[in-house]
From Swiss-Prot:
Protein name stated in the entry: Palustrin-1c
Propeptide, chain numbering: 23-39
Signal sequence residues: 1-22
Organism lineage string: Eukaryota, Metazoa, Chordata, Craniata, Vertebrata
Pfam families noted in UniProt: Antimicrobial_2, FSAP_sig_propep
Tissues and organs where the protein is expressed, per its UniProt entry: Expressed by the skin glands.
InterPro entries reported for this sequence: Antimicrobial_frog_2, Frog_antimicrobial_propeptide
Subcellular localization: Secreted
Domain of life where this protein originates: Eukaryota
């Protein structure tokens, strides 16, 4: 139970940091007004979220099968 809470806390922390960085980048992109850069940033954010989701799924699978 403790390791599950620790893992979820880590995922939450990493997600919060990622979101914070995304908001800063979004603010900078809005000032520039360049649509192409915004699209590239959105794609990089989605890739980061995909990696985070894969890590969460792998962790959940590991905990469910108890093969950690």
């Amino acid at each position: 139970m403790f390791t599950t809470k620790k893992s979820l806390l880590l995922l939450f922390f990493l997600g919060t940091i990622s979101l914070s960085l995304c908001e800063e980048e979004r603010g900078a992109d809005e000032e520039e007004g360049d649509g192409e850069k915004l699209t590239k940033r959105a794609l990089s954010i989605l890739r980061g979220l995909e990696k985070l989701a894969k890590m969460g799924i792998a962790l959940t699978n590991c905990k469910a099968t108890k093969k950690c």
